[in-house]
């Protein structure tokens, strides 16, 4: 049986491909995706948002009589302290209560609340239109992107950008909060494992039970900072490898400079550079995914990550 797959964000860091259509926004990207055997479709998703995708998929499903699927990419932030998620215990991605937990979450950050709402809307609308939905969650992803587009990630990049601008590595959290991590290859293999299972016609947990965190485990932010600070000091990007707290009101000038370096509102600096997330990956292993890299690998890879980011910034 043949399937059609539409991938959005194909030019991004996490973009993957198969037998597919790829959403692009420029002629150059269209040429690039053709080299991967994909047919480019050019449009802007701000115009055709998730709800429209799902509604249209629902029509495809009822006309063809075949199962249709929608895989939404979210992020671990949506399951963290920043998003009002519980952090006093491991939050398992196969917890049958996760949908209700997400429904009850309240975030003081509008953008994060919108991302929480997006997950809930995808699940609800998909259910309504007979579409099977999956919420795929990357976390701190590291390693070189293998696609034709963006080669570098998000959170490790924010650490380097802030350090470069301030010539020092600052931490913005009290205590020792941790966050799940994942090598880009493992992130991709979970995505592909989900696709493989769906295409094989298997009844993969979906809808309210369809959350998939791509992570081999968590690390403490400060350990990541320390490893990256050593790599940054070695390259004279920062004066020395010490990680300095920037937490209170007396540090507001420092936080203002970090804000400027990251190009985000001041209250979003801790969202970009820290926070606590106890989201824990179980679902992936249940569908046969086995990550290759343990969480500590990000610390060993910090030197290469810094090199990669500095080369691509
Ligand atoms: N990388 C991580 O560590 C990480 C962690 C957690 C969650 N995530 C989430 O995963 C998703 C993908 O991340 P990424 O690292 O691959 O991001 P990225 O490198 O910035 O790529 C974003 C992709 O989305 C496309 N895009 C953005 N706005 C669009 C629009 N309005 N219409 C059509 N296409 C649009 C971009 O196309 P152009 O090339 O044309 O701009 C690009 O292909 C994001 O939602 C991100 O928040 C990523």
Locations of the language-model features?
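N-terminal Rossmann NAD(P)H-binding glycine-rich loop of SDR-like oxidoreductase domains
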Residues: 2-19
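Conserved Rossmann-fold NAD(P)-dependent oxidoreductase catalytic core, especially the SDR/UDP-sugar
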Residues: 21, 56-117, 126, 134-137, ...
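NAD(P)H-binding glycine-rich loop region in Rossmannoid oxidoreductase-like domains
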Residues: 24-66, 74, 78-79
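Flexible, glycine-rich beta-alpha linker
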Residues: 131-157, 172, 177
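A conserved pocket-lining segment of Rossmann-fold NAD(P)-dependent short-chain dehydrogenase/reductase
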Residues: 158-185, 190-194, 198, 204-207
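Non-catalytic, hydrophobic alpha-helical segments
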Residues: 187-191, 214, 224, 284, ...
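Terminal hydrophobic/aromatic helix or amphipathic segment near a protein terminus
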Residues: 204, 213-278
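Amphipathic terminal alpha-helices
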Residues: 285, 292-313
